[in-house]
Design a protein with these regions (language model features):
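Short, Lys/Arg-rich N-terminal segment immediately upstream of the first membrane anchor
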Residues: 1, 323-324, 354-355
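Hydrophobic secretory-pathway targeting helix
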Residues: 1-23
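Short, glycine/alanine-rich hydrophobic alpha-helices that insert into or span membranes
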Residues: 9, 336-339
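N-terminal catalytic or cofactor-binding beta/alpha core of small enzyme domains
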Residues: 17-290, 294-321
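Juxtamembrane/start-of-transmembrane alpha-helix segments at the extracytoplasmic/lumenal side
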Residues: 321-335
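C-terminal membrane-anchoring or membrane-association module
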Residues: 340-355
Length: 355
């Protein structure tokens, strides 16, 4: 009967008209015991990091050796284990191995919020531009692993501070914040452009925490005077496609009345991140990559930048679900009524039909 497909269609429509809800965090992996925490404002620690970017202050970027890469990979692996398994031994081992690279791993109890973090940063006696890496000490295993990155600090209009705000606001749902330690244009041949280097400590950290099913959000900024026709925010996955995280972020930004553009392979090509090294790695390993270019108009407008930061934070807290659609209660009621009518009619017809 032709009416049956119609009924099925109505049922399907009614199902998808329901609001989208996502399960709350059921279990929270607390930081391990046996760690000595330094209680101070995390922002104070981060300010030290921000004040040491090479390019902002005099200095020279130093190329790591193969041994440096191997040692850092060990450190990052131990941190990953320490957080995911709440294992104090791994954190203590990571701290010990980090000293071989003149890095320090600081367990910080943020006095402003009570949240706990591990901060991996170069000792103050050295400054090679290798970057700093912050990790939430408490991990929510029911959430999508999220990494926030700022590969172009200083140059990209305060991108490192924007990334930090999202990282801390979404605690503990963001696994890590990765921040380059050098201004992107310092090297004459692109040596310090971490978004386009296949070998760097920054890339090593990216690869250590980018896994199948994770989401990497990279924060960038562009000068509106150089791109006057672009919207306030341009999003891209790097190859002209769209992933769920990108769609969810775009939806939240639109709800905040921020104009957005999505690189589709053609439009917004200059801001599309086609050659972004971290994006290529993420896509190859089944992770979602979201490259976010923010107009300088937004960055220097307190209201707009707050809207941007809150939109991304909410996307993360919602596990990249779309904002709920308003339910139309009439649809499921009508569908149920039609189904009931034809069920009764069919039953009566079968009774009157001769055997």
């Amino acid at each position: 009967m032709p009416i049956i497909p119609v009924i099925v269609l109505l049922v399907i429509v009614s199902t998808f008209s329901l609001p989208v809800h996502y399960s709350s965090v059921n279990t929270s992996q607390l930081p391990p015991t046996g760690i000595t925490w330094v209680t101070k404002p995390l922002q104070q620690v981060y300010n030290v990091i921000q004040n040491r970017f090479i390019g902002l202050i005099p200095g020279n970027y130093t190329e790591p050796s193969s041994s440096d890469y191997s040692t850092m990979n060990t450190v990052l692996g131990l941190i990953d284990t320490g957080v995911s398994q709440s294992d104090a031994g791994s954190i203590l081992s990571a701290s010990k191995v980090a000293t071989q690279l003149n890095y320090q791993l600081i367990p910080v109890n943020d006095s402003a919020t009570g949240n706990k973090y591990y901060v991996l940063m170069e000792n103050t006696t050295v400054n090679r531009g290798w970057g700093s890496y912050l990790f939430a000490a408490e991990m929510s295993p029911s959430r999508t692993p999220v990494i926030i990155e700022a590969p172009h600090p200083v140059t990209d209009f305060n991108s490192q501070e924007i990334a930090y705000t999202i990282f801390t606001s979404a605690y503990p749902h963001v696994t890590a914040l990765l921040v380059s330690g050098v201004e992107r244009t310092l090297g004459p041949n692109g040596e310090t452009d971490m978004a386009h280097r296949t070998q760097s400590i920054f890339e090593t950290a990216h690869e250590a925490f980018t896994k199948f099913g994770s989401v990497v959000i990279q924060i960038h900024g562009f000068d509106a005077s150089h791109h006057p026709t672009e919207p306030l925010v341009v999003l891209s996955d790097g190859d002209g496609g769209i992933n769920g995280a990108l769609q969810a972020i775009a939806s939240h930004l639109e709800d905040a009345n921020l104009s957005i553009g999505i690189f589709d392979g053609f439009t917004h090509e200059k801001l599309g991140a086609q050659k972004n090294v971290q994006g290529r790695y993420a896509r190859a390993f089944g992770a979602g990559f979201v490259h976010s270019e923010i107009s300088s108009i937004v960055v220097y407008n307190d209201t707009m930048i707050t809207q941007y930061e809150q939109s991304l934070t909410q996307s993360i807290l919602n596990n990249f679900g779309f904002p709920a659609y308003q339910i139309d209660i009439k649809i499921p009621i009508i569908a149920l009524g039609i189904m009931s009518f034809f069920f009764v009619a069919n039953y009566r017809f079968s009774k009157t039909r001769p055997d």
